[in-house]
Curated annotation (Swiss-Prot):
Pfam families in the cross-refs: NACHT (PF05729), NOD2_WH (PF17779), PYRIN (PF02758)
Membrane topology label: Peripheral membrane protein
Entries under PROSITE patterns matching the protein: DAPIN, NACHT
Biased composition (Basic and acidic residues): 633-648, 659-673
Name of the protein: NACHT, LRR and PYD domains-containing protein 10
Gene behind the chain: Nlrp10
Record carries keyword Lipid metabolism: no
Assembly and binders: Oligomerizes. Interacts with PYCARD. Also interacts with CASP1 and IL1B. Interacts with NOD1 and components of the NOD1 signaling pathway including RIPK2, NR2C2/TAK1 and IKBKG/NEMO.
Location of the protein in the cell: Cytoplasm; Cell membrane
Length: 673
């Protein structure tokens, strides 16, 4: 049998029916009585010719579904050649339907914080670096740049096909925007032509909304079509690419997690995978994967930073002023390497300029940057004047919402939840995104923070805005214990980084002034213990750095240094020396000391740290003579000093309110606050 190539499902259906012998055609009608949705009467079917039957089915179901209905009946008759013919026609036609669906999504896509399509720096690495942050581990090796176009090139790696690519990067580096742009480019034929029949984007944050999460429903959800031809789509798994975006945001112990884990192990569907994640989640992700390729997302180059500013500031004078302000602040300029933080900085400066306000803040770390943004965008009263009562109420409500989400692994919130916290979603677009989710015939609204970084910032703030010690409660102490428990996290989370910055003396004073609240003395006492607990573990863990060090020459910093027990800190000192040279100080430190909190007891981490406190720096060779830092526009040579500190140089210091606080005298990292 030689069936002609059909140009449409209608044509294919007619060809298949005409190819049947008379007895086979009668048998088909018999099967159609049972499989058709409206149960056609026997007499009605018997009188229909091939053309009439095709027309009747198409009018009842539409061309695509009519082909599927006939295909199921032919399968029952074991006419496999005709089944394969119809399935292939259906699949070929549905590919274009799906591409059109993806292209239409772009028009109503909310790209979130990282809405720019600027090119990002991608570096290929042979491994993830185990449990360490890529910012540290990959300094020890030469990183090769990689393009999105070559991520799945057959010659890219010697790994078995289909390939797995793990794309890792700190919060805000642009992973989500990058993969959404990848899907759009594929749908337009610009990327991977002829390589993938389908590229499915799965948000690990939003997949929990699926009422029934299994693989067929997941594919239908991706297609935006409850009647998607799942069986035909899965027939060639090697031509499928699933993009699992934000593995670190996947809700634990959920049905969605189970389904995605099955997909990652690729036993049932051996497809290509692209998984994006923040580094802390790699420890749980990697055991499920076989051979894979690791790519680091490192944010903007210098050129792309300026391009991004140009897209944000259309007024030339504002653009000039914004660039000058950022370039004159080494911390801000470095921070703007991260697209998410660059968006925060641009939005903050633009709002200040629109109000005609002078920018008096000088951020010294990422916490200061988020603080400046939040204090600028907190709502005003009806007259346009800032109302301390309104601002403080909204701040507390945002903090309580963020804390509830973090406690329950929740990143999406229904409107009722916002109302419970006294928040009005539409009026808080500076902090919240709205997502329209189709539930049956209706639309249900969900809200999320504009970026996970905002939720973690407000979560850290929630420890400070409580009005008295009773509000801290046992639950709060358990939360802090969980944050600092070394068994739970090999890396310091972003929430913990924010909290550590806030608990510094100058940090708490600054927050109180900006947000017009005073930290209650009893709460301050609790926070002191939290700070001591964080300091006890900060030397033992790697930090999930927001500002990735991508310059290949920076790897010289680790030459001759054993990174297992030594903590490496980079400081830019003497910025205003007359010779204009930027000194670079590298300090190694070992953890020591035992901190006891009345709420947390003798933490396991302190016992482990005491054992390590007697160590010595191993194999310290003479460091590289200089490091070029193109991100800070410096071509000068630096120098490095290696200093071993037994206890990190903790000193006692009195703050303005007479509270005894501990301050790290040697380990202050100017680049990360």
């Amino acid at each position: 049998m030689a069936l002609a190539r059909a140009n449409s499902p209608q044509e294919a259906l007619l060809w298949a029916l005409n190819d049947l012998e008379e007895n086979s055609f009668k048998t088909l009608k018999f099967h159609l009585r049972d499989v058709t949705q409206f149960h056609l009467a026997r007499g009605e079917l018997e009188s229909l010719s091939q053309v009439d039957l095709a027309s009747k089915l198409i009018s009842m179901y539409g061309a695509q579904e009519a082909v599927r209905v006939v295909s199921r009946s032919l399968l029952a008759m074991n006419l496999m050649e005709l089944v394969d013919y119809l399935n292939q026609v259906c699949l070929n036609d549905y590919r274009e339907i799906y591409r059109e669906h993806v292209r239409c999504l772009e028009e109503r896509q909310d790209w979130g914080v990282n809405s720019s399509h600027n090119k990002l720096l991608l570096m290929a690495t042979s491994s993830s670096g185990g449990r360490r942050s890529p910012s540290c581990s990959d300094l020890e090796q030469e990183l090769d740049p990689v393009d999105v176009e070559t991520l799945f090139a057959p010659e890219a790696e010697s790994y078995s096909t289909p390939p797995i690519v793990v794309m890792q990067g700190s919060a805000g580096t642009g992973k989500t925007t990058l993969v959404k742009k990848l899907v759009q480019d594929w749908s337009k034929g610009k990327l991977y032509p002829g390589q993938f029949d389908y590229v499915f984007y799965v948000s690990c944050r939003e997949v929990v909304l699926l009422p029934k999460c299994d693989l067929p429903n997941l594919i239908c959800w991706c297609c935006g079509d409850d009647q998607a031809p799942v069986t035909e789509i899965l027939r060639q798994p090697g031509r499928l690419l699933f993009i699992l975006d934000g593995y670190d945001e996947l809700q634990k112990s959920s049905r969605a997690e189970c389904v995605l884990h099955i997909l990652m192990r690729r036993r049932e569907v051996p497809c290509s995978l692209l998984i994006t994640t923040r580094p802390p989640a790699l420890q749980s992700l990697e055991p499920m994967l076989g051979e894979r390729r690791h790519v680091l997302v490192l944010g903007f180059s210098e050129e792309e930073r300026e391009t991004y500013f140009s897209s944000c500031f259309t007024d030339k004078e504002q653009l000039k002023n914004a660039l000058e302000f950022v370039q004159n602040n080494a911390v801000l300029y470095k921070a703007c390497q991260v697209p998410g933080i660059c968006w925060v900085v641009c939005s903050w400066l633009k709002k200040k300029m629109a109000r005609g306000q002078e920018v008096s803040e000088t951020p010294s770390n990422s916490t200061d940057i988020f603080t400046a943004y939040v204090s600028t965008f907190l709502p005003t009263d009806g007259n346009g004047d800032s109302s301390e009562l309104t601002r403080h109420k909204v701040l507390k409500s945002l903090c309580s919402l963020a804390a509830e989400g973090m406690r329950h692994q929740r990143l999406l919130f229904e409107e009722e939840v916002l109302r419970k916290h006294g928040l009005d979603g539409p009026s808080l677009t500076a902090f919240l995104n709205c997502i329209d989710y189709r539930a049956g015939l209706g639309i249900k609204k969900f809200y999320s923070f504009r970026h996970i970084s905002f939720q973690e910032f407000f979560y850290a703030m929630s420890f400070l805005v409580k009005e008295d010690q009773s509000q801290q409660g046992e639950a709060t102490h358990k939360e802090v214990a969980k944050l600092v428990d070394p068994e739970n996290h090999e890396e310091v989370t972003l929430s913990l980084q924010f909290l550590f910055d806030m608990l510094k003396t100058e940090g708490t004073l600054s927050l109180g002034l900006k947000f017009c609240f005073r930290i209650a003395p009893s709460v301050r006492q609790d926070l002191k213990h939290f700070k001591e607990q964080i300091e006890a573990i900060k030397y033992k863990r790697s930090w999930d750095l927001e500002f990735s060090l991508y310059d290949s020459k920076i790897k010289k910093l680790t030459q001759g240094i054993q990174m297992k027990d030594v903590i490496l800190n980079v400081q830019h000192l003497d910025e205003k020396k007359s010779d204009k040279k930027k000194s670079v100080s590298v300090t190694s430190s070992f953890s020591s000391g035992k901190v006891q909190s009345p709420f947390l007891g003798n933490d396991k981490s302190t016992r482990k740290q005491k054992k390590a406190s007697n160590g010595k720096s191993r194999g310290a060779e003479e460091p590289a003579p200089g490091v070029r830092n193109r991100r800070l526009a410096s071509r000068e040579k630096g120098h490095m000093e290696m200093n071993d500190k037994e206890d990190g140089g903790v000193e006692e210091q009195e703050d303005e309110e007479g509270q005894t606080l501990k301050k790290d005298g040697e380990m202050i990292d100017k680049m990360n606050g």
